[in-house]
Amino acid sequence: MNKSILLAIIGISTFAYGAYTPLKAEAAQYMIKSAWNVANKTGYQVKPWNWMDSHPVIRLKSAKHNQDLIVLEGDTGNVLAFGPGRNIESEHPGRKGTTLISAHRDTHFDFLENVVIGDRFEVDSIYSQDGYQYQVSDIKIIDSDKVDIDISSSQSELKLVTCYPFNAVVAGGSLRYVVTANLVQKS
């Protein structure tokens, strides 16, 4: 009898531990979207929770790829654990220059593998009343050990960056998948 109880406790504990991470991720996304809604209405920086070292700044949507992502400020490991992040040295959407957004290849940016030239992204920012549409103009793979991602464009562009290859068994390689899109419309 004691063996059965012990096995049941181990089984329940294993299930609970396995469910904890996805539940935590769902709760985080809910809080991030709630913070975005407040920030988008007020223009103020709103943290999703008190100890978070970032705040939502951009909403990135693609109807074709069924994506509606809230982008956080900064692209540190702590930020990317919760969602896509805007590189703080890059421009805000709609301005001349590059808006650089990064995310993990196996979570928020896994859909980039299916993006093709001509696809469009809708972008909103807490720093602008305008919405923007960007159209994909280039897709390339670079080695980040040899080439830096250029963010000095003379026009308004969006770069979405993730690790490559998408199906890599080991994470942390130097290859990056870079999707570049140009501003085509303000709304």
What positions do the PLM features span?
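Solvent-exposed, non-transmembrane regions of membrane-associated and secreted proteins
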Residues: S4-S187
